[in-house]
Amino acid sequence: MPEEGDADYVLGTHDEEVARLGLQHRVWRPVVTECWQRVGITHGWRVLDIGAGPGYATADLAEIVGPTGSVLGIERSARFLEVARERCRRRGLTNVEFREADLMEVSLGQLGLDASWCRWVACFVSSPVKLVENIAGALRPGGLAIFHEYSDYETFRFMPMRPALERFAQEVMASWRATGGEPNVARALPGLLRDAGMRVLEIRPRVRTVAPRDYAWQWPSSFIEINVARLRELGRLTDAEGAEVLREFRAADADPQSWFTTPMFLEIVAQRE
């Protein structure tokens, strides 16, 4: 039986999802680390990792801030926290603290931290307002909040277009909304950050177009396979519809002229005033 905090995860917390999140982190890691370096995260910083998951970004942040810095990872899945703690133990990281908490139910309080990192979390929570307020309150004046959140999930698209994969993307978005999330939440973040006493410093769109020969093609591949099964469980796809999605993806994967555009997200950097 899943732990109470794991049962309602939209994408699940099983081993396959842990592995998929690792692949996802590797695909986007160059973009992420470039962002962290650009905003100045370095030795001695105290960083908050929101929705730390299995700890992929947490461990990278801990290595960047070094032994004189620290990382606080917040995650509500006991399963993910188990994996994250083991990851940090294997990498010899002693500057990481994890807390099992649901940010929709608790307040972090005034922690005086230097920066926060939030990737693909705001799109799943029931109250982005509360999430942003929690983050703002945890930062020191001048502290930075960094977000990678979807703004145009509709750009999830294969070329040539394939009808079952188009419907799959629509059902993914609908499943998030059915649990209180919003796939295009980044559109609202600048206003929410302003209302929480933060100043937006920069916004950058992040989107890629990849072919089957590209490493990043594995990202939609793993996402589709796992989420077809998840959408079947939720009753959003029949077995026949799920099989057609997988058939269309196999056809795209075998076609060297196929292309995939990733769902666009925004890289938002804001500063607490």
Describe the residue ranges of each PLM region:
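A short acidic, Gly/Pro-enriched loop at the edge of an enzyme's catalytic core
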Residues: 107-115
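Conserved catalytic/acceptor-binding region of the Class I
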Residues: 146-214
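A short glycine-rich, Lys/Arg-flanked "PGG" loop and its adjoining helix->strand segment in the class I
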Residues: 129-144
